[in-house]
Amino acid sequence: MTKKNIKILGSGPTGSLLALNLASKDCNVILIEPLEEKDLLSKDKGYAITQSSRRIFEKFGLWELIEKSAYGFTTLSIMDQEISSSVIVRANDLKKINDNQINLGWVIDHRDLMKILIDAINGNRYINKFKVDSIDDKTFDFIMAADGRDSPSRKKWKIPYLKRFYNQRCISFKAILKGAPKKRAYEIFRHQGPLALLPLKNCTYQIIWFSSISDTQNTLNLSDD
């Protein structure tokens, strides 16, 4: 079977995982990323990892490294303030395919995840990185774009897409919360929008807070005092 030559535009988590997956199939991958590695590592955010994601990382041979950097949570508290109802999901509620897992899921810092992906890419002989997209597109069997929400590639290729405005914005930050049960994540459904609290190490949580544009702006304008 002839090896495929593939160009990937963008090397964030999506583009990096795509490159590693295709390289595992012995495809020749050109990865275009104008940012320096330090800039790719600079985002201050966390990601939730599900059991499905874990199995994907296992297939890529990355899970052992990721698990060492991720923080596992054993319970998930789901609360709906609109109907005043809540439920706690535990690891023993997982499907049988995951019955050997003690954690319900995991949370990993962006920097830790990207460091693992970058190291894997740098050590892969099927992946070559370039900062500038100067190679003729005709030399590739496939070109794939993973260059963000406002994808320049999508605009260049004039790919139609639908967008809906929900009059909401998201604030994402880390905070120390004391007194909460250990290794518990929270998903809270509110009238203003959902609120997620993802546990990291040392009582630190990644907070993902959706609210109306006006409420979000008022929150951001609050004084530190």
Q: What kind of feature is each model-predicted range?
A:
Residues 146-225:
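Conserved FAD-binding catalytic core of PHBH/FMO-like flavoproteins
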